[in-house]
Amino acid sequence: MSDIGERVKKIVVEHLGVEPEKVVDAASFIDDLGADSLDTVELVMAFEEEFGCEIPDDAAETILTVGDATKFLEKNAKS
């Protein structure tokens, strides 16, 4: 897993309180990790803060899995 992937995983574990081994690329934030809509908004905000980038609403709606978040951030992260 890339450095960005590891950072995404850490944020997900901290925000959702899930076991690290459950946070895999294919894991859906809602279906697999138990997030609700507020959790997903908070995750997006945490990703923006951690990686120094803005995630537009239309892009945020396409980030449904851990892998989606990692791919987006690998392309758009500033730090």
From Swiss-Prot:
What residue stretches are annotated with the Carrier domain? 2-77
Q: Where in the cell is it found?
A: Cytoplasm
Q: What is the lineage of its organism?
A: Bacteria, Pseudomonadati, Pseudomonadota, Alphaproteobacteria, Hyphomicrobiales
User: Which pathway?
Assistant: Lipid metabolism; fatty acid biosynthesis
The alphabetized list of GO BP terms reads: lipid A biosynthetic process
Q: Which residues carry this modification: O-(pantetheine 4'-phosphoryl)serine?
A: 37
The record's GO molecular-function terms, alphabetically, read:
acyl binding; acyl carrier activity; phosphopantetheine binding
Q: Could you describe the post-translational modifications of this protein?
A: 4'-phosphopantetheine is transferred from CoA to a specific serine of apo-ACP by AcpS. This modification is essential for activity because fatty acids are bound in thioester linkage to the sulfhydryl of the prosthetic group.
Task: Print the keywords alphabetically.
Answer: Cytoplasm, Fatty acid biosynthesis, Fatty acid metabolism, Lipid biosynthesis, Lipid metabolism, Phosphopantetheine, Phosphoprotein
Principal cellular location given in the protein's record: cytoplasm
Output the SMART domains linked to this UniProt entry. Answer: PKS_PP
Q: PANTHER family attached here? A: ACYL CARRIER PROTEIN, CARRIER DOMAIN-CONTAINING PROTEIN
Which species is this UniProt entry from? Bradyrhizobium diazoefficiens (strain JCM 10833 / BCRC 13528 / IAM 13628 / NBRC 14792 / USDA 110)
Provide the function of this protein. Carrier of the growing fatty acid chain in fatty acid biosynthesis.
What is the name of this protein?
A: Acyl carrier protein
